[in-house]
């Protein structure tokens, strides 16, 4: 019996080892890689059923608010059929992408291909960041919303070195490589010594980008990589609308060749919102062809200052065409039990559902008017981990979900995202 147990242990270890050696090839579902803390909430999905009527896909790279440095606020957004993504905040980037690219079905669904040398999880994650994230919308400059971008910035650029570009031709025509080829660099692209204007855009309001440039990318906290060709800053005015075609370093004669592709076929409008003593941002993204809209809120909520947070959000709702709205990303840092005076610019479930009332009442309505939000997905960001005493013995995610559903009077589809699980919108 003793020897039988030893033999069984040996085979178990061999099997576990083979899973590690094969890296991502065996991970067809997220539960094969890690077990979420709690499955008693709806976390969306990207199966054929989930995506049947969807236009967009979002990928949570980081879902918590503080403490968990491996999963801080960050999402990717793309249109179905595209392999280019826009970052929405960037608290955690590399860890979320690493988890994502280890899912075999993800790579096939998005037709993601890698250079022959990219066999390790870290190589694939870094390649994805370089070749598939086109740029970043940053809502405010707190570290839990920009730290991932700062830390991975040294590797966030396609290199003209032979081991990355020439080896990957002609097999890879997706992501940024596909974009650059469409712009007209087909003949000389593999052999050029530098990629013309290959800087990724960092887009935000003045206060956010000024802080990133002077407090983070300043040569002291982190090397000033935007000054060395990694990024370009694009400053948005409050309430102004811009085309993504104008938020790129490429000349217009090149951008017109991709103007019907995501994200260049989208408009973005920014709104200054309250985050206690800091100015945060809400972004409305609008498809210029279909009119469909996505709203992304960086941190916001009840303030200890005189900032009128509800009025600021009201201005966002007044720019929403309710029948075109696909999703709202918004934070719920705390549960309903937390008092107003310790929220410091954050929200609770009861605050969010009041905002849903306001959205339905103040958005641009149809005729006859819509009376519910059943067509809208509500993606909850920035849930802080449950670290204190809790009489319910539940995770923060489950408590927030339950409290939202208890007062969900408009039928909005509440989603508590899990890191690395794509969600169709």
Swiss-Prot record:
Secretion signal, residue range per the UniProt entry: 1-17
Protein name: cAMP/cGMP-dependent 3',5'-cAMP/cGMP phosphodiesterase 7
Cell location: Secreted, Extracellular space; Cell surface
Any one GO MF annotation of this record: 3',5'-cyclic-GMP phosphodiesterase activity
Disulfide bond entries: none
Keyword Ribosomal protein among UniProt keywords: no
Lineage top rank: taxon: Eukaryota
Induction annotation: Down-regulated by growth on bacteria.
Family as reported in the entry's similarity comment: Belongs to the cyclic nucleotide phosphodiesterase class-II family.
Keywords: cAMP, cAMP-binding, cGMP, cGMP-binding, Hydrolase, Nucleotide-binding, Secreted, Signal
GO cellular component, one term: extracellular region
Gene coding for it: pde7
Its EC number(s): 3.1.4.35, 3.1.4.53
PROSITE patterns in UniProt: PDEASE_II
InterPro entries: cAMP-PdiesteraseII_CS, Pdiesterase2, RibonucZ/Hydroxyglut_hydro
A biological process from GO: negative regulation of glucose mediated signaling pathway
UniProt lineage: Eukaryota, Amoebozoa, Evosea, Eumycetozoa, Dictyostelia
Gene3D superfamilies in the record: Ribonuclease Z/Hydroxyacylglutathione hydrolase-like
